[in-house]
């Protein structure tokens, strides 16, 4: 356990981790402070951060299991102590860590007798088990046990429905949230005019509290970026019903207008989430610290190909968007 003395900055606003510990493989704890804040700011930030931590961070879970020769979820299999339903409930609790985009397949293939644990799951290279000791089933006889698994990365909660059922394949309610709990508290100082925000984070081990805080912060920033680029001339106040309709206005409209007025285009003011890239391309670029159009143009085609999960088709799609809307191209090689 790491614990630091709480010292309050009186000038620069800053986050600081004051306590960090690992209670188990599936329970991490971290306590952070943000200061100095003026009265009211701590509650505003604390509420937004807690919601982002609990609802916006992606996690990886098993969402579907395929058995051979099972008639329904509550059937039993000869040579296995647990029923199909109990095995599904055990698989629901398996904690995974990954940089997966979308879904992938995994499996378990083992011969009894013996215990089946998370360690026996055969995973693709980009997915790993957090706690290999998690129990799945007990094979009481020398039988061959094989099941297929579907793994998905998402956020929030997935609830199975009857429409999700297939022959021999069963969906699992999936809790994707890596953050198990988050609390915030506020301490006042300086004649009650300034505040310190305390934020406590518990995670399931797939992310550390510090990683969770960083991802939640990035997600909140992404939510507010559109407001930074909204132009007042696109807001039309209607006196009749006192509403403000927002006309459709994309970054491409902004570029066209700048060119028409012969004004210089600021590449660092255009963020990649404004470029309408597919989710896979956007996530790959973001994880490689490419956030703006200027960041993107500082990379060659060869640099982008080296990004994990990036393919030539993705680069071609980027080149198409850059050429169509900006008349720009990526350098073939920066060396």
From Swiss-Prot:
Its EC number is 2.7.7.6. One of its GO terms (biological process) is DNA-templated transcription. The lineage of its organism: Eukaryota, Viridiplantae, Streptophyta, Embryophyta, Tracheophyta. Transmembrane segments: none annotated. Disulfide bonds: none annotated. GO terms for molecular function: DNA binding; DNA-directed RNA polymerase activity; protein dimerization activity. Belongs to the RNA polymerase alpha chain family. Residues 1-231 are annotated as: Alpha N-terminal domain (alpha-NTD). It catalyses: RNA(n) + a ribonucleoside 5'-triphosphate = RNA(n+1) + diphosphate. Keywords: DNA-directed RNA polymerase, Nucleotidyltransferase, Plastid, Transcription, Transferase. In plastids the minimal PEP RNA polymerase catalytic core is composed of four subunits: alpha, beta, beta', and beta''. When a (nuclear-encoded) sigma factor is associated with the core the holoenzyme is formed, which can initiate transcription. The N-terminal domain is essential for RNAP assembly and basal transcription, whereas the C-terminal domain is involved in interaction with transcriptional regulators and with upstream promoter elements. It comes from the Eukaryota. It is found in: Plastid. This is DNA-directed RNA polymerase subunit alpha. HAMAP family: RNApol_bact_RpoA (MF_00059). The keyword Repressor does not apply. DNA-dependent RNA polymerase catalyzes the transcription of DNA into RNA using the four ribonucleoside triphosphates as substrates. GO terms for cellular component: DNA-directed RNA polymerase complex; mitochondrion; plastid.
């Amino acid at each position: 356990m790491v614990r630091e003395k709480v010292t309050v900055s009186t000038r620069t606003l800053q986050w600081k981790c004051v306590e960090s510990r690992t209670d188990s493989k599936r329970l991490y704890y971290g306590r952070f402070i943000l200061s100095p804040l003026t009265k009211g700011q701590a509650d505003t930030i604390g509420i937004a951060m807690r919601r982002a931590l609990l609802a916006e961070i992606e996690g990886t879970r098993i969402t579907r299991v395929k058995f051979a020769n099972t008639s329904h979820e509550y059937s039993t299999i000869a040579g296995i102590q647990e029923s199909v339903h109990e095995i599904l409930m055990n698989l629901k609790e398996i904690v995974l860590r990954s940089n997966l985009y979308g879904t992938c397949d995994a499996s378990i293939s083992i011969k009894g007798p013996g215990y089946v644990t998370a360690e026996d799951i055969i995973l693709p290279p980009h997915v790993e088990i957090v706690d290999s000791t998690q129990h799945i089933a007990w094979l009481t006889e020398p039988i061959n046990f094989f099941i297929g698994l579907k793994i998905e990365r998402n956020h929030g909660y997935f609830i199975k429905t009857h429409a999700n059922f297939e022959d021999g394949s069963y969906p699992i309610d999936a809790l994707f949230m890596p953050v198990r709990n988050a609390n915030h508290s506020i301490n006042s100082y300086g004649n009650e005019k300034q505040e310190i925000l305390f934020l406590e984070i518990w995670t399931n081990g797939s992310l550390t509290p510090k990683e969770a805080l960083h991802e939640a912060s990035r997600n909140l920033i992404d939510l507010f970026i559109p407001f930074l680029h909204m132009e007042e001339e696109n807001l039309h106040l209607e006196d009749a019903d006192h509403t403000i309709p927002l006309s459709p206005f994309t970054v491409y409209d902004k570029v066209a207008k700048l060119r028409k007025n012969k004004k210089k285009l600021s590449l660092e003011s255009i963020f990649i989430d404004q470029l309408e890239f597919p989710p896979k391309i956007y996530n790959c670029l973001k994880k490689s610290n490419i956030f703006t159009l200027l960041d993107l143009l500082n990379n060659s085609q060869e640099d982008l190909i080296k990004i994990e999960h990036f393919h030539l088709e993705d680069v071609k799609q980027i080149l198409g968007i850059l050429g169509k809307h900006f008349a720009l191209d990526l350098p073939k090689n920066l060396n």
